[in-house]
Amino acid sequence: MATTPIEKLRLRRTQQSTIYEAVSAAILLVMWIIGIVAIARHKAETDILIALTTISIAAVLLHLASYRPTQRWVRNDFEIKTVRQAVVASKFYRIFAIEVAMFGLFIAINGLIHFKNKVPEVIKGGTVVSIVFVTHIAAHRKLKKVREAEKLEQQQKSAER
């Protein structure tokens, strides 16, 4: 059986990945429905369509990146060296896709009911940034644990020889 180089690795679809994609698709569908209703009721400008389109494309690209996390176009800030690391990165790309979709949903809801005028400025800007930052930190920590476990396994194998 031939081995695939890590640069050409493509992860398979799993039940978990399908669930993440279905959740993301449902959020995007609701986002678009609310956005179109907001425009139809003249509560939002048509510029909201540009934001919703951009967010939809970003969510789709993140799901695509989850299947090929080692590709150069994905632009990880960490180097993936093993399949286990690729699987961990893949899960976080899917979680990030759902976060991006939720951000779009909040934009659409704001277009309909204008809740941003009722929320303090700190909460408006800080919430989204903090959620993305916490996800990034969690992914980095999980990858670090995976790398440490792999080093430990490697040391145990070399000690057995």
Residue spans for each PLM region:
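N-terminal juxtamembrane cytosolic/stromal segments of multi-pass membrane proteins
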Residues: 1-19, 154-161
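Short membrane-interface loop/juxtamembrane segments of multi-pass integral membrane proteins
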Residues: 6-10, 75-92, 159-160
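Alpha-helical transmembrane segments and their helix-start/interface "positive-inside/aromatic belt" motifs
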Residues: 11-26, 47-49
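Select subsegments of transmembrane alpha-helices in polytopic membrane proteins
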Residues: 18-28, 61-64, 89-101
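Alpha-helical transmembrane segments and their membrane-interface junctions
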Residues: 30-39, 98-119
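Alpha-helical transmembrane segments
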Residues: 44-61, 124-131
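Membrane-water interface of transmembrane alpha-helices
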Residues: 57-77, 136-146
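Alpha-helical transmembrane segments and their immediate juxtamembrane interface regions
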Residues: 120-158
